[in-house]
Swiss-Prot record:
B box-type ZnF: 90-132
Domain notes: The B box-type zinc finger domain and the coiled-coil domain contribute to the higher and low order multimerization respectively which is essential for restriction activity. The coiled coil domain is important for higher order multimerization by promoting the initial dimerization.
Reactions catalysed: S-ubiquitinyl-[E2 ubiquitin-conjugating enzyme]-L-cysteine + [acceptor protein]-L-lysine = [E2 ubiquitin-conjugating enzyme]-L-cysteine + N(6)-ubiquitinyl-[acceptor protein]-L-lysine
EC code(s) of this entry: 2.3.2.27
GO cellular component, one term: P-body
Organism taxonomic ancestry: Eukaryota, Metazoa, Chordata, Craniata, Vertebrata
Modified residues (N-acetylalanine): A2
Annotated organism of origin: Pongo abelii (Sumatran orangutan)
Residues annotated with Phosphoserine modification: S86
SUPFAM superfamilies: B-box zinc-binding domain, Concanavalin A-like lectins/glucanases, RING/U-box
Protein name (record): Tripartite motif-containing protein 5
The entry's keywords: Acetylation, Antiviral defense, Autophagy, Coiled coil, Cytoplasm, Immunity, Innate immunity, Metal-binding, Nucleus, Phosphoprotein, Transferase, Ubl conjugation, Ubl conjugation pathway, Zinc, Zinc-finger
Record gene name: TRIM5
Length: 493
């Protein structure tokens, strides 16, 4: 009820020109009221004779001087703006401004309006349609847009999941790298600790040897001094005694005095001492980085038994050793121990056939006085002559190997010279520390085979370049005549 009254009041204070609530209302002689702006705009269209103008509603003439502000209507409009319509009047199907039902849709503004809004200045000239006419069309558009948004939502969720997964992956990778860095630097610290301990042991040994020698020299000098002191005392006693005491055995005393020879003690000039040199940390780091890099390609290598090799293989296929010597009985009950007559027949191949990629493995050769290891392109029966002279261990026969003899002689086997191609070119290798563990790195595409001394922090022992890999190659181990086994290390060792 109250809302209906308010609606009627709004109609009374609505400008007939703009159909909005009156703004600065002005009243004419006929009683109609208009917005000041609307009436001013209308003056240009309704001018009559003698300066008179006509009312836009009833066409009754009026004099501009008779126009007066309608304060009463202005107050009503002000109060009306402050009044809120009842909940019934605020329903979404009624215009908040005019209280009329919202039955029209303005295409230009994209709004639902009432019939009074359609006639207002704001929507004049716009294309309007009944809401029922456009509802289905916009429902289809909204449904299509909704499907598109749902697809976008799904894509966004997938992207969110991807970025979350990438974030977790990066976190895992960084954590792994942190662990690797900690492990690497821990290993470097172990290397430095080993170098420090080794150098201190050398200094302690040097101190012990020098002090022992000097102590011996000191003892000899004390004895020598005491002998001279006793001889001086004897001579002084003779000089202070009687003539008989002076002459008794005087020739012997004089001879003893003349034969006195002072033996100079053994000394150790400081300029001849071994000079301590700190390890080359830069070179050590470079070697360490290279070893760390190739160890990323560590493969688990085991050996493959065959009918050619006489090598003894462990059950886990990791250890290879020389067979038991054969007992030969000679004349009169004498016995002789003989080994297999050629080193070739104690060689064994790894079970992995390599035709591409990068591969790394390590072999434990500690306590062995002889061994050969590296890469082999397969056994070559036609190269089994003069095996004792290592003539088959050449790249031309498919061998890229290094070896140890007599516990100290480390060598690499290269192809023979042009004049004597059958005889291998033995390359003596200078190793500061004899390796107890050797790393082998094969880069098939780069045609290289590298050997690392793991015992000496991974320093490079030797590298074969420009290798001709025309067929599959295999890891190769040969324990020679040393019965101590050589062991293929697992990647986790």
């Amino acid at each position: 009820m109250a809302s209906g009254i308010l609606v009627n009041v709004k109609e009374e204070v609505t400008c007939p020109i703009c159909l909005e609530l009156l703004t600065q209302p002005l009243s004419l002689d006929c009683g109609h009221s208009f917005c000041q702006a609307c009436l001013t705009a209308n003056h240009k269209k309704s001018t009559l004779d003698k300066g008179e103008r006509s009312c836009p509603v009833c066409r009754v003439s009026y004099q501009p001087k008779n126009i007066r502000p309608n304060r009463h209507v202005a107050n009503i409009v002000e109060k009306l703006r402050e009044v809120k319509l009842s909940p019934e009047g605020q329903k979404v199907d009624h215009c908040a401004r005019h209280g009329e039902k919202l039955l029209l849709f303005c295409k230009e503004d994209g709004k639902v309006i009432c019939w009074l809004c359609e006639r207002s200045q704001e929507h004049r000239g716009h294309h309007t349609f009944l809401t029922e006419e456009v509802a289905q069309k916009y429902q289809v558009k909204l449904q299509a847009a909704l499907e598109m948004l749902r697809q976008k939502q799904q894509e966004a969720e997938e992207l969110e999941a991807d970025i979350r997964e990438e974030k977790a992956s990066w976190k895992t990778q960084i954590q792994y790298d942190k662990t690797s860095v900690l492990a690497d630097f821990e290993q470097l610290r172990d290397i430095l600790d080993w170098e420090e301990s080794n150098e201190l042991q050398n200094l302690e040994k040097e101190e012990e040897d020098i002090l022992k020698s000097l102590t011996k020299s000191e003892t000899e000098m004390v004895q020598q001094t005491q002998s001279v002191r006793e001889l001086i005392s004897d001579v002084e006693h003779r000089l202070q005694g009687s003539v008989m005491e002076l002459l008794q055995g005087v020739d012997g005393i004089i001879k003893r005095m003349q034969n006195v020879t002072l033996k100079k003690p053994e000394t150790f000039p400081k300029n001849q001492r071994r000079v301590f040199r700190a390890p080359n940390l830069k070179g050590m780091l470079e070697v360490f980085r290279e070893l760390t890099d190739v160890r990323r390609y560590w493969v688990d290598v085991t050996v493959a038994p065959n009918d050619i090799s006489y090598a003894v293989i462990s059950e886990d296929m990791r250890q290879v050793s020389c067979p038991e010597p054969q007992i030969t009985y000679g004349a009169q009950g004498t016995t002789y121990q003989t080994y297999v007559n050629f080193n070739y027949c104690t060689g064994i191949l790894g079970s992995q056939s390599i035709t591409s990629g990068k591969h790394y493995w390590e072999v434990n050769v500690s306590k062995k006085s002889a061994w050969i290891l590296g890469v082999c392109a397969g056994f070559q029966p036609d190269a089994m002559y003069n095996i004792e002279q290592n003539e088959n261990y050449q790249p031309q026969y498919g061998y890229w190997v290094i070896g140890l003899e007599e516990g100290v002689k480390c060598s690499a086997f290269q192809d023979g010279s042009f004049h004597n191609p059958s005889a291998p070119f033995i390359v003596p290798l200078s190793v500061i520390i004899c390796p107890d563990r050797v790393g082998v790195f094969l880069d098939y595409e780069a045609c290289t085979v590298s050997f690392f001394n793991i015992t000496n922090h991974g320093f490079l022992i030797y590298k074969f370049s420009h290798c001709s890999f025309s067929q599959p190659v295999f890891p190769y181990l040969n324990p020679r005549k040393c019965r101590v086994p050589m062991t293929l290390c697992s990647p986790s060792s």
